[in-house]
Amino acid sequence: MKKQAHVISHSHWDREWYLPYEKHHCLEVEFMDRLLDTMERDPDFKSFHLDGQTIMLDDYLQVRPEKKELVEKLVKEKRLYIGPWYILQDEWLTGSESNLRNLETGMREAARYGNVSKVGYFPDSFGNMGQAPQILLDAGIDCAAFGRGVKPTGFNNEVAENDNFTSQYSEMFWESPDGSRILGVLFANWYNNGMEVPAEPEEARKYWEEKLAGAMKFASTDHLLFMNGCDHQPVQTDLSQALMTASELFPDITFIHSNFMDYCRCLKEEHKEDLAVIKGELRSQETDGWYTLANTASARIYLKQMNARCEALFVRAAEPPWLMNGERNTLMICWPTAGKR
């Protein structure tokens, strides 16, 4: 079988990070305008993964409500993949119920737009909660992708070469304490290993020789993952031409503008039976210089205290009596509102 290069277009989108929310919001509108234009103009631009969130569409349509019909069309056609989360979260800085409601809200909102991407997506979480496989399986999701927490993580987030791999491959089984098990995919070459693919032949040859070798080093099957994007990365508008160039240069490789659903399906059909089993929390601190969780738990304690108080009020004070005789929509807005904060 020929090796298949699955190129998945995406952009990792923090609503707030090095800029305040509204500045990122303006950038997101520009980003989405360009993405939708590309998808309308180029039928060979097969799909785009919207970072495992649905809130990006809410933010975009707040400014561009006239684009709602087009957005829903692309979601239903499985060209624009959204969810299953409402918003990407740091799993350790919120209560456990928040993680459940984030997934519940995201799947409900994605279904409202027309389709749910059933891949547990944790691209840049600073470690992952041990019960994630159990929670995902309960939601009908049996595959997850993540970038951190499996040891050892090398410099620039690449897996280090030594004999102490927790997982020999970028694919593994991830198991919760209750025994729930899903297929896990580690971004061993990070989630930007397929960004800015050159369309010019000479540059493309050098690019793909390096990228293919990097992916083959860790892949357990002939299906190689290339993430075409990075943090707040604009869509690559000439990707279709770039993949045509790659196909001409490397006839022994099948280049596919893919999506996580197809990629995970291929993995499940062909993965090795002796994959490593990673159990519980993914919180490895073993690195060659970068600590995956440093300085995240103790920053801005007052905000964490306020968030914890809100969650406690929802779960222990407001919802129990509401469940007895409350109007359904009264508290439905609470968790999405808290998630935005």
What role is predicted for each listed range?
Residues 1-341:
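Catalytic-domain carbohydrate-binding cleft regions of carbohydrate-active enzymes
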